């Protein structure tokens, strides 16, 4: 004997899903049904379950009217023992704002208590197993379910309509502790994708008009022109940034935005570049975001911090250049060539001034001078580092 709370936004298949998962098995097992779900079609149910209509026992309570809501609110006064209660929009029956004083109006008369009826609302839900009642409740939001019911239920069932990602008639069913909302990943006990059989929708009237439509958010992503356009723009920006399209003459028209030759002589002052003597070309002419990092109008922002893009950084006594990458303990490590040898970027973790942020494809990285609020956009030169040992000598003069 259980209390099931099925909840989800309108159109998330909570009623049809609960009917399919809870009500039909109860009917098949011969249970007496007490429900407020309108327009149940017994003939279609019987055909689907392969049983006779005469074997289906359903008691309908019209909760669209106040008298019906009060009757259902006191179900333990009169409900047959071992009945299955299927109550739609339970927040209308027992609003969560009801106080202990309000609920006393639902208390059982002494003569019914003498007939082994629960004496109060709280006792009815706490002892539903004792009386053989299974109770299935649906609501748009589990917050609309009274706390005393949630405490007795233990488990909630959250519905999410997968039509929002183009998969009509499917929903994700997440089980969770009824004390929480089920909306966080950490709340989920189990998660399943389910598809409701089409005959289920013809077994009841989901609206007072008898007509219902799937969520308008159910347009498939690959059919939405705005989404396709957005994906196209994002793809071009990432390609422009990560795959060197800003250096391709086909895209640049052969302008001087290309990186200078790697064969040029080292600069006289200590700078950071993508190769010895080369100049880092900052992507200042376009804007995009990767996670918390955004590039726009010649500036790089990371969270609340803002840095001006520059062509080089002044680093005392030595220059740093990206020389390649190396697989170490299954982790891709970018090295820098210094006067002391090749230094992994991990050593920058101990720096108060300089920080290094690799971008997702490790083709580029950003070096931040936190004191000067400057950022240098650097492209990784492929190949092995000059030295593989981690030479830390003299690094204190930098960091």
Curated annotation (Swiss-Prot):
InterPro entries: P-loop_NTPase, Zot_N. One of its GO terms (molecular function) is toxin activity. The keyword DNA repair does not apply. It holds the Pfam family Zot. Changing residue 100 to A: In strain: 569B and 86015. Keywords: Enterotoxin, Toxin, Virulence. Changing residue 272 to A: In strain: 569B. Increases the permeability of the small intestine mucosa by affecting the structure of intercellular tight junctions (zonula occludens). This is Zona occludens toxin.
């Amino acid at each position: 004997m259980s209390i099931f709370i099925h909840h989800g936004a309108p159109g998330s298949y909570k009623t049809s899903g609960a009917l399919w998962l809870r009500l039909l098995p109860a009917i098949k097992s011969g249970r007496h049904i007490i429900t407020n779900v309108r327009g149940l079609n017994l003939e279609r149910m019987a055909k689907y379950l392969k049983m006779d209509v005469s074997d289906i026992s359903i008691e309908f309570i019209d909760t669209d009217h106040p008298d019906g809501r009060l009757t259902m609110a006191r179900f333990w006064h009169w409900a047959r023992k071992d009945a299955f209660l299927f109550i739609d929009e339970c927040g209308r029956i027992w609003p969560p704002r009801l106080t202990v004083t309000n609920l006393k109006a639902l208390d059982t008369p002494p003569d019914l208590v003498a007939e082994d009826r629960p004496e109060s609302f709280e006792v009815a839900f706490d002892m539903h197993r004792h009386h053989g009642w299974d109770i299935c409740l649906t609501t748009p939001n589990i917050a609309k379910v009274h706390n005393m019911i949630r405490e007795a239920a233990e488990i909630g069932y959250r519905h999410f309509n997968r039509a929002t990602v183009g998969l009509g008639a499917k929903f994700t069913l997440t089980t969770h502790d009824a004390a929480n909302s089920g909306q966080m990943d950490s709340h989920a006990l189990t998660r399943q994708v389910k598809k409701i059989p089409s005959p289920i929708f013809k077994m009841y009237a989901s609206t007072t008009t008898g007509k219902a439509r799937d969520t308008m958010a159910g347009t498939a992503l690959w059919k939405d022109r705005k989404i396709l356009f957005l994906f196209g723009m994002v793809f071009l920006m990432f390609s422009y940034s990560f795959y060197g399209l800003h250096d391709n003459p086909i895209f640049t028209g052969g302008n001087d935005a290309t990186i200078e030759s790697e064969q040029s002589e080292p600069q006289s002052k200590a700078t950071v570049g993508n190769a010895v003597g080369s100049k880092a070309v900052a992507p200042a002419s376009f804007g995009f975001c990767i996670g918390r990092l955004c590039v726009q109008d010649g500036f790089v922002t990371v969270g609340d911090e803002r840095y001006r893009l520059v062509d080089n950084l002044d680093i005392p006594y030595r220059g740093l250049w990206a020389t390649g990458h190396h697989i170490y303990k299954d982790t891709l490590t970018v090295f820098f060539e210094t006067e002391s040898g090749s230094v992994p970027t991990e050593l920058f973790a101990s720096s108060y001034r300089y920080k290094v942020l690799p971008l997702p494809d490790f083709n580029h990285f950003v070096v931040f001078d936190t004191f000067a609020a400057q950022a240098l956009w650097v492209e990784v030169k492929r190949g092995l580092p000059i030295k593989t040992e981690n030479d830390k000598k003299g690094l204190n003069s930098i960091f």
